[in-house]
C-alpha cells in the first residue's frame, strides 16, 4: 500500500522521469522529419540539375542538327562553300608561306560537278593540286594523296630537248637522210642493190630545181615534153596530159580502137578551138555513125 501511495504521490520519481522520456521521443521525431526534408530537398535539387543538363543537351543537339541542315543546304545550293570561315585561316597561311594568288582557288568547271557531291570543298583540293604540280609531283584522284612524278611531260622528252610546245618536225634534208639509211638497210636485209620504191616514197623535184634545169639548157630553148619516166620513177610534173581520143565501135570487131584523125582535121580543130560537138556534155565522148 505504501508503494502504491508513493507511486501516486505528486513528488514521486516516476512523475519526474516522464517528461524526459517524452522530450527524447519528440527530438527523435524532429530529427527524422528534418532528415526526410533534407533528403527531399537534395533529391529535388538533383532532379533540377539533371533536368537542366538534359535541357541543355537537348538544346545543343537541336542546334547542331539545325547547323548540319543549314550546312547541307548551303553545300547544295551555294557555289561559294569553299570560302568558309573555318578554312580561311589555313588559306591565309598558305598565301603567306607559298605565295599563292587567288586564281588557284577558283577551280575550273570540270571540278565543280565532282566537288558538289563530295563533303570536301573544291578549293582546298584544287589548291593542293596546283601546289603539287608546281613542285613537280603528280596529284592522283580527288583525295589528298600526292606521289612524286617519275617521268616528265612528253614535251620535255623531245629529241632536241627543247621546251617549246610545238611538236617535233623533221626537215626535208633529214627525211632524205633517213630514207637513204632505210634503203641501205633494206638492201642488206634482202641482198639486192636495186629496190623499187612505192609512189608515196618517191621524191618529186621541187619547182625551183625544174626551173633552173629548164633555164640552163644548152640550146636556149625549152625541152620537149614527153611521157618518159624520170630517173626516180615518177613522171615529169611539167608535162601536160594528152587529149582524150575518141573511140569507134563496129559490129565486126568487138575491140574498141581509137580513131586516127588526119592532119587537116587536127589543124582545123586547133585553129577554131570550138568543135561542132561539145565533148564535155556527153559522158562517153564523141560518137561517130557507122
Swiss-Prot record:
- Asked if Aminoacyl-tRNA synthetase is a keyword of the record, the answer is no
Which parts of the sequence are annotated with region: Disordered?
A: 1-125, 150-169, 204-290
The organs and tissues expressing this protein are described as: Expressed in brain (at protein level).
Q: Which UniProt keywords apply?
A: Methylation, Nucleus, Phosphoprotein
Q: Which GO CC terms are listed, alphabetically? A: nucleus
* Result, substituting residue 107 to A: No effect on interaction with spliceosome factors
Biased-composition ranges, Low complexity, are 19-31
- Give residues where Omega-N-methylarginine occurs: 135
* Any Pfam family matching the protein: RSRP
Q: Where is the composition biased (Basic residues)?
A: 32-123
Which positions does the record annotate as the modified residue Phosphoserine? 12, 107, 109, 274
Post-translational modification note = Phosphorylated. Phosphorylation at Ser-107 and Ser-109 mediates the interaction with spliceosome proteins.
What are the Basic and acidic residues biased-composition ranges? 150-159, 224-238, 266-281
Q: Where is the composition biased (Polar residues)?
A: 239-255
Per the UniProt entry, what are the Gene Ontology biological process annotations, in alphabetical order?
A: spliceosomal complex assembly
Where is it located?
Answer: Nucleus
Annotated family: Belongs to the RSRP family.
Tell me, in a sentence or two, what this protein's role is. Answer: Probably acts as a spliceosomal factor that contributes to spliceosome assembly and regulates the isoform switching of proteins such as PARP6.
Write down what this protein is called: Arginine/serine-rich protein 1
Top-level taxonomy: Eukaryota, Metazoa, Chordata, Craniata, Vertebrata
Gene name of the encoded protein: RSRP1
Amino acid at each position: 500500500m505504501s508503494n502504491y501511495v508513493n507511486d501516486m504521490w505528486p513528488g514521486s520519481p516516476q512523475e519526474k522521469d516522464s517528461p524526459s522520456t517524452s522530450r527524447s521521443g519528440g527530438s527523435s521525431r524532429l530529427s527524422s522529419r528534418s532528415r526526410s526534408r533534407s533528403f527531399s530537398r537534395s533529391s529535388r535539387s538533383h532532379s533540377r540539375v539533371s533536368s537542366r543538363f538534359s535541357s541543355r543537351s537537348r538544346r545543343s543537339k537541336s542546334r547542331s542538327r539545325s547547323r548540319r541542315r543549314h550546312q547541307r543546304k548551303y553545300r547544295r545550293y551555294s557555289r561559294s562553300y569553299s570560302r568558309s570561315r573555318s578554312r580561311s585561316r589555313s588559306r591565309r597561311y598558305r598565301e603567306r608561306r607559298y605565295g599563292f594568288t587567288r586564281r588557284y582557288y577558283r577551280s575550273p568547271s570540270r571540278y565543280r560537278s565532282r566537288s558538289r557531291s563530295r563533303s570536301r570543298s573544291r578549293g582546298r583540293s584544287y589548291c593542293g593540286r596546283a601546289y603539287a604540280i608546281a613542285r613537280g609531283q603528280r596529284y592522283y584522284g580527288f583525295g589528298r594523296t600526292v606521289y612524286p612524278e617519275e617521268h616528265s611531260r612528253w614535251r620535255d622528252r623531245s629529241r632536241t630537248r627543247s621546251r617549246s610546245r610545238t611538236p617535233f618536225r623533221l626537215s626535208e634534208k633529214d627525211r632524205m637522210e633517213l630514207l637513204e639509211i632505210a634503203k641501205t638497210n633494206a638492201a642488206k636485209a634482202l641482198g639486192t642493190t636495186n629496190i623499187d620504191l612505192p609512189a608515196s616514197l618517191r621524191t618529186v623535184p621541187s619547182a625551183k630545181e625544174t626551173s633552173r634545169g629548164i633555164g640552163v639548157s644548152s640550146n636556149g630553148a625549152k625541152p620537149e615534153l614527153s611521157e618518159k619516166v624520170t630517173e626516180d620513177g615518177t613522171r615529169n610534173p611539167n608535162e601536160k596530159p594528152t587529149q582524150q581520143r575518141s573511140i569507134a565501135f563496129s559490129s565486126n570487131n568487138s575491140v574498141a580502137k581509137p580513131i586516127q584523125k588526119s592532119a587537116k582535121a587536127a589543124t582545123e580543130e586547133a585553129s577554131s578551138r570550138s568543135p561542132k560537138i561539145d565533148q564535155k556534155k556527153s559522158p562517153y565522148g564523141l560518137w561517130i555513125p557507122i
